[in-house]
Amino acid sequence: SYSYESEIRYVGGCLRKILNNEKVDDIDLATNLNPSEVSEILKKNNINFYESGIEHGTITAIIDDHKFEITTLREDIFTDGRHAKVEFSKDWKKDASRRDFTINSLYADLDGNLFDPYNGKKDIEIGQVSFIGDAEKRIREDYLRILRYIRFFLNYSKQPHKEEVIKTIKINISGISIVSKDRLLDELKKLLKSNQLEKLSKDKFSIDLLSLIFPELKNIKSVINAIKDKKKLFVEFDFIFILLLMVIDETDNLEYFLYKYNISKKDKKRAYAINNFYNGKNVSKTLNELSLNKVLYYYGKQAVIDILNFKIIKTKKVDKKLLSLLEFYRNKTPPRLPIGADLLMTRYKIPEGRQLGSMLKLIEDEWVRNNFEISDKQIDNIVKG
């Protein structure tokens, strides 16, 4: 029901990755159809989709459990350094011109024919990260592009930073303060997950920029070098662990970071487990089986592994004892209190309520204190007072 001019093309990251011989995770598509036409086609073909990004022209189709973001061509009507107000378009060149870097302004039809109005393919080949058109204009449309520039530079550049780009970023860096903390953290996550992170330790300009944007990140260079030196000992670290290596110190730096940035409850728990263990304590005295068993019980296995990895990374010479502890706790299940409320009620005739809770807490405290061992006699003594 649509004319031969209606079209859909692959766009952006998936093409950039293919041309750079990388694994493709997500496939994004662009179309000159408007969102209502896209949803009509998907309905006719019984393809599930959702419209959470429809105000920006994006509909997400789900095929064989894979998500495909289909976005209508757009042009910017208004930008304020954080958001763009867009109008839907039929013009592929205008859609390309609103993107940040040449290597992201690539399109290909379903036969693989490339539409590359800003020579992004050539920039991938020579390893050059170039803003489309005027760098200052691009940055002032959305100041997050300063942080995105660092990420793409690490992943794709084989050339040094251009002097005019350095100058433009330095002039406009203060604009990053209007970008939402969630967007900044999301971009930092992508950056720290980069397999080119080692390159960052040699890039003073990028380190200085990161330190300005995220002043809570300490010792970026030394942390990356320490990870590189001990890489053979570990599985790959996740974003949160690398972040915590840079944030946790003897001060209240972590508290300040968690106040500013919204991370999940699960990740906060990991952060506090490491921080409580290391912050202002003599770690060599506390790093023993009893203390680690307590962490295992209260925080879970991941927290123990984090604490041991943290110590290994922060220590110049790796102690073999730490490596054996790491192996031991990878295979250890958290301890379980050998008596529960039901048994207390039946064995000791304690009624349900506050007294039962208090008694369970006393038993638990004694059990933890005795390295998670307690006899029936000890339980009897606690209950009978």
Where are these regions (language model features)?
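Catalytic cores of the polymerase beta-like nucleotidyltransferase superfamily
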Residues: S1-G385
